[in-house]
Amino acid sequence: IVKYLYETQKSSVAHIKRINMRMESNFMHLDVQSRSSLDIIPSLYGVLNFTKTTMGARLLKAWLESPLCDIAAIEWRQELAGEFFADLNLRRQCAERLGGIYDMERIMSRIALKNCNPRDIIALKKSFDEIKKLSSLIESCRADSRLREFFGGAGDFSGLSELIGRAVKDDPPLSVRDGGIIKEGYDEELDGVNKIAHNSKEWLLNLEQNEQKRSGIKSLKIKYNRVFGYYIEITKANLGAIPENYIRKQTLANAERFYTPELKEMESQILNADERQKKLEYELFIKLVEEIAAHSERIYHAARAIAVIDVLASFAEAAAKYDYVKPEITCGDEIEIFEGRHPVVENRMNYMGFINNDTMIGGGHSHVQILTGPNMAGKSTYIRQVALITLMAQTGSYVPARKAKIGLCDRIFTRIGASDNLAAGQSTFMVEMIETANILNNATPRSLIILDEVGRGTSTYDGLAIAYAVIEFILSGGGKLLDGARTLFATHYHELTVLDKTFSKV
């Protein structure tokens, strides 16, 4: 994989420190259509996002798009989120500390690629300082705290923070080539160059005064021009008093210009001081970056831990603000939701006037539910609500309900809305049939299937026939491929309600 990336990206892949193997069976499958229909990003993400770091926000998106199918992992997330939920003071103090932590993952990637700037390094130092405070805060949790156990290995970066503090100015320029980065006292050679650059006028004045005393020539002057550089100018009346080490440089009508080995050396230092300063600072900066890069694995580990803490604290904040509850996750086939609410619609209504709903699918209840009702009755909202609550539960989040018990779902399939694909030459009906066929061919007994108005893209009776056939196929188990798949089917075809007379699962 790394070789492939190196060949295709045409750049260094040094920032990739490890590749984690992902077992697909441990994650819920959400296809593009389901993600779009449920509007996970940005709508659900917007409701749950109380993260304080860029890393946490990025991880929250990843978790919402890949819910878990591992009960132990889900319960671990619930337990840590529960600690934040139960302690408002801990939640607020952690949020304050997290707010001062920068995007360490991206900074470390730039460091690995040697594409970072001085402000990245200062941002890293500030992050290290906040991590230390956050670590102290979490260490104050009870001894058996899972949160304390998890974050205890995040690492102490006091040494790196102190090194950066000694080396880099608090408000450095953006470009590493501009100089003005390294603090005074960090490097002796650089201090000498800086002293030359900053104190050259004072040094030249002292040299002029010393040469006046040594030669006894009061009119002796040290001057500069771009052609000849620095020189000592003496009038012709005083030529007899010049010291032996003076070397003639130029003859004028009324004066002679000289230089000394000392002045020549200092001239070179003064004229090259700015260039040398920038070069030295660049070398010292690169050396500092390499020192930080040597700790990249520890820093990446800490960054990941910070992101996880941020997301779990965000779950707790959402649960406290919106009155969510911790769902029970089981290996069964039930979805039992008492007084469930659509998280996004409820949020947009400012929590006023939303009618909650109970849901009982599987686990002794019917596996297939057919919803009928007039337009604007809330059918689409309800079926999306069930899917979102299931998804949130398997993400490790609390859910909008009074009580919830969710049997693991390996996939969520949706067929919602009407749209065509003109670029592919597909009509609205064609798109609808392709998506429905995809569901019927790929769903499993542990899937959750959401179907809204299947058959709407054609004539009434043809649509009714299609809807009837789809439900019948699901109820018959599709040749056992999806026997027991939990299904919500919203429709205007009231004729479908007779199916409960034929099938016990409706």
Q: Where is each model-derived feature located?
A:
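Extended, charged coiled-coil "arm/hinge" scaffolds of SMC/Rad50-like chromosome-maintenance ATPases
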Residues: L252, E256-E290
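Short hinge/gating elements
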Residues: L44-N49, L60-E65, V176-E189, R248-R257, ...
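ATPase nucleotide-binding head domains, primarily ABC-like/P-loop NTPase cores
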Residues: F50-T53, A57-W63, T235-E267, V308-V506
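Flexible, glycine/threonine-enriched loop-and-boundary segments that flank and lead into catalytic domains
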Residues: E202-I222, D323-V325, H342, N350, ...
